Design a protein with these regions (language model features):
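Small beta-barrel nucleic-acid-binding modules, principally OB-folds
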Residues: 89-101, 130-137, 188-197
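Short hydrophobic beta/alpha edge segments that flank linear recognition/processing sites
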Residues: 128-131, 158-174
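Residue-level detector of conserved, well-ordered beta-strand and adjacent loop positions
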Residues: 97, 132, 142-145, 158, ...
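Long amphipathic alpha-helical coiled-coil/heptad-repeat bundle
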Residues: 1-4
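Zn2+-dependent peptidoglycan hydrolase active-site motif and core
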Residues: 109-150, 175-183
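Short nucleic-acid-contacting surface segments enriched for D/E, G, S/T with interspersed K/R
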Residues: 150-158
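Surface-exposed, glycine-biased beta-strand/turn segments
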Residues: 11-127, 159, 172, 213-218
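Acidic, glycine-rich catalytic/binding loops that coordinate metals and/or anionic ligands
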Residues: 158, 165, 179-218
Length: 218
């Protein structure tokens, strides 16, 4: 699926209209609402550029699917929902749930070509890895159980390359596991004038659903 310049512009307007929480209807590119008609070009144009960079750089779904499992990887639109661990905050990502609650089983891969910018433990994210794409988008993968061999800061990765395995690490001191079910927290960030902007990954994951890598886990 490819989009033209006008479609990226509509995508950006939808993003602003919904305070960053893009709806499933965004891809259908509905007629402009009065709100979007009144948006000044300088307000939405930067976001159109960001989405064009984001979508032109991603190539595959972030979790390798099991060809024998009918249910596969599931996810819901949970971006912006309330979280309480570590203080009241909003969920800045989408949680991808495996068909079986088994850590160190389901492979997590890079959705794009890029460079490992961050890696290691975070209290909230557990064992996490952050990839900066060639077009400047930052992709955040959290709660891993382990990393792929040789994965380190500064390493160049290709789309589809193994980053590590889905787990349940986080919410405590380094090595903490079992505070929640096994899953991958997947986040996307833009940077505008030095400010980090969290983007709802849900629509992007829908975009990537037909770009899954397949493997026989069981």
């Amino acid at each position: 699926e490819t989009w033209g310049k006008d479609e990226y512009e509509e995508f950006a307007k939808d993003f602003l209209y919904a305070d960053g929480k893009l709806e499933k209807t965004s891809k259908s590119l509905p007629s402009l609402s009065w709100y979007r008609i009144l948006l000044e070009r300088e307000t939405w144009e930067p976001y159109a550029v960001y989405y064009q960079k984001l979508l032109s750089g991603i190539k595959c779904f972030p979790v390798v699917s099991d060809k024998k499992e009918k249910e596969g990887i599931s996810f819901e639109d949970s971006w912006g929902m309330s979280r309480s661990y570590g203080g009241k905050r909003l969920h800045e990502g989408t949680d991808l749930m495996p068909p079986k609650n088994q850590r160190d089983t389901f492979a997590v891969v890079s959705v794009c070509d890029g460079v490992v910018e961050k890696i290691g433990w975070l209290e909230l994210g557990g064992y996490r890895i952050g990839i900066r794409s060639k077009t400047g988008t930052y992709f955040y993968y959290a709660h891993l159980s382990s990393y792929a061999e040789g994965m380190k800061q500064g390493k160049t990765v290709k789309a589809g390359e193994l980053l590590g395995y889905m787990g349940d690490s986080g919410y405590g001191a380094e090595g903490t596991v079992g505070q929640f079910p096994v899953h991958l927290h997947f986040g996307i960030y833009f940077y505008e004038n030095g400010k980090e902007i969290s983007v709802n990954p849900y629509e992007v994951l829908l975009f990537l659903e037909n770009k899954k890598l397949i493997y026989s886990y069981f």
